[in-house]
């Protein structure tokens, strides 16, 4: 808010416009864009933002950044749930590809599910969205929650899993690699590496 006020005092405007959607949506120009600040300024820059995706005005200064924290808290919980679910499936001995096909049209399905589950099944942890970047956002959410004097128990679990990834040298891998935490805890290997024929 301090930077916002400095810009305003200097006769300028400042908008916070974090994005979500990862590399594929950035390339396609379909990012979710969360913009906070003066509404009039948002209206002026909306056509520029629209070149990159779908801008939504979230309210006053810093509201875009807080909205992004909400997005990443929820996204982190979904990612950890996917990792846990697929480790559970592997331990139970059911086919992961069949599980994916059977569940992707249900409540569990969605863009993140469609993006990450095939990576888990193939054990492809090439970074598209690095755990390190997401962990930074989770730490920011925890910091803000502390300022608000609130508990975030599910986000605590997400941070615990991401901290384990950091401590075990997997922090720069794709978010799909979160399954490695559950492989360690459940004593199971999830997915298969594809080999060239």
What is the predicted function of each stretch?
Residues 44, 63-185:
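Helical "substrate-binding/catalytic lid" subdomain
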